[in-house]
Amino acid sequence: MAVLGKFIIDLRLDGYHFCLLANNGQLLYDSTGFASEEGVMKGIETFKKACEGNDFVIYQDKFGRFRFVLNKRYIGEDYKERAQCEKVTASVQRFAKDSVVVPYTPDPEKEQAYAEAKANAKTGKDIDWEAVKNEPVPPSGKFEVEEEGDGYHFSLLANNGQLMFYSRSYATEKSCVEGIRTFQKAAYIGNFIIDQDKFDRYRFVLRSGSGVIVYIGESYTTRDRALKSVESVKKFARSATIVFPYRG
């Protein structure tokens, strides 16, 4: 008899997520948010097909963390050891195809919170970006652009070197720098929410003014630490200088 995992669906402030769990309950993959229940169901099927294609690559970032990237689209959890990441990657391949999908259970409280979060999102249309650009702000923190195995990433670092945000991959250096500019605008507009998943991890979710681009922050064990990370991102993102260590 096959050992089955399961897909569970959870509604959070940034949308409907699906999580792939092993048969022992271990989290193997947590998706980004989808706008609707129908969207997340389609997302599960697309993820399954991607797993069948077996286009998994394991990367190590500049902070020594390992994660799998599937089909250049799905990014796994962070792990301290390559062996851990390889084990989880094998489990995703093993469980994704035949895992049962646990239907979403309607939750009026969560649905109301999600609706309010969408309704209260700011667009930034009333912001004079030229005036913002010309406001005198002392440099603080830095964006580090790095060329890694899956492309270019940027990291937002505080003055003491603490990691505030680590981006997805970009195909070119130019697109990565453009990504920084978009991130800076999003942080200034300020559509931050604190996401708590079923495993009691907290992280910020930042949406761009258009709502199309989503940035996921680092994971924390308490809401307070996640809230502090939001304030740090707001503080440093606006005035951080952009550096390219690999240029020498």
Language-model features, listed with the residues they occupy:
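A structural feature that tracks compact, well-ordered secondary-structure segments
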Residues: 17-21, 28-33, 43, 59, ...
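Intrinsic disorder/low-complexity detector
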Residues: 1-15, 25, 49-64, 93-151, ...
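Structured core of small recognition/catalytic domains
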Residues: 174, 188-191, 231-248
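C2H2-type zinc-finger recognition helix
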Residues: 37, 82, 173, 223-227
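Amphipathic alpha-helical interaction modules
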Residues: 39-55, 184-188
